[in-house]
């Protein structure tokens, strides 16, 4: 189970500063008027996990668009736990220069690992820790961007099937049945 623990956001989209501690149990509701930052808050979590804007695959958004207007940099730090592992993901965007990332993985009862700072290595490790749920799978299933509720429905059959298999963990099940 993935449990969000803490989120810090600075100069991301329309969010100036957020320091949010999530409850250990229960449901979380983001409520507010239009343009209050609810979607930006969710996109900051998505960005922390995958390092891309939600709309990046559609050519609608670049990474610089995530930096608050008038600011030169944005940062997002997300702490989450997955089983006995805790991940601390920090991503910083420098307008016009791309992003830097640091991933710290802490395993219960194990010595602390060295932080991972290479973008590709970090992204792959996060996807692995998330049970192979990549950005496309999350975006097509349960993390729907505004005005894209029909996204899963409009995918070609084979892509829809692949997305659902990843989401439900059926690929792992198929591999296990082949092994035994």
Task: Go through the PLM ranges and name each one.
Residues 1-115, 128:
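Extreme N-terminal "head/tail" segments of very large remodeling/mechanoenzyme assemblies
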Residues 29-31, 140-180:
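Extended, Lys/Glu-rich alpha-helical coiled-coil stalks
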Residues 41-44, 102, 121, 125, ...:
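Alpha-helical scaffold elements adjacent to nucleotide-binding pockets in ATP/GTP-utilizing enzyme cores
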Residues 66, 125, 129, 167, ...:
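Residues that form generic nucleotide/phosphate-binding pockets
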Residues 78-83, 120-148:
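Flexible, charged interface-and-hinge segments in very large macromolecular machines
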Residues 114-117, 151:
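Short coil/turn segments at secondary-structure boundaries
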């Amino acid at each position: 189970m993935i449990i969000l623990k803490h989120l810090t956001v600075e100069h991301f989209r329309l969010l100036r500063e957020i320091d949010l501690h999530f409850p250990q149990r229960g449901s979380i509701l983001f409520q507010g008027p239009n343009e209050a930052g609810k979607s930006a808050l969710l996109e900051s979590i998505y960005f922390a996990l995958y390092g891309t804007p939600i709309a990046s695959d559609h050519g609608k958004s670049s990474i610089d668009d995530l930096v608050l207007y008038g600011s030169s940099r944005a940062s997002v730090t997300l702490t989450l736990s997955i089983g006995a592992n805790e991940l601390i993901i920090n991503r910083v965007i420098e307008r016009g220069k791309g992003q830097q990332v640091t991933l710290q993985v802490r395993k219960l009862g194990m010595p602390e690992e060295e932080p991972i700072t290479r973008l590709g290595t970090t992204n792959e490790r996060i996807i692995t820790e998330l049970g192979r749920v990549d950005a496309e799978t999350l975006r097509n299933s349960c993390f729907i961007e505004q005005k894209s509720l029909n996204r899963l429905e409009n995918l070609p059959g084979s892509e829809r099937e692949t997305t659902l298999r990843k989401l439900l963990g059926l690929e792992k099940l198929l591999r296990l049945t082949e092994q035994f």
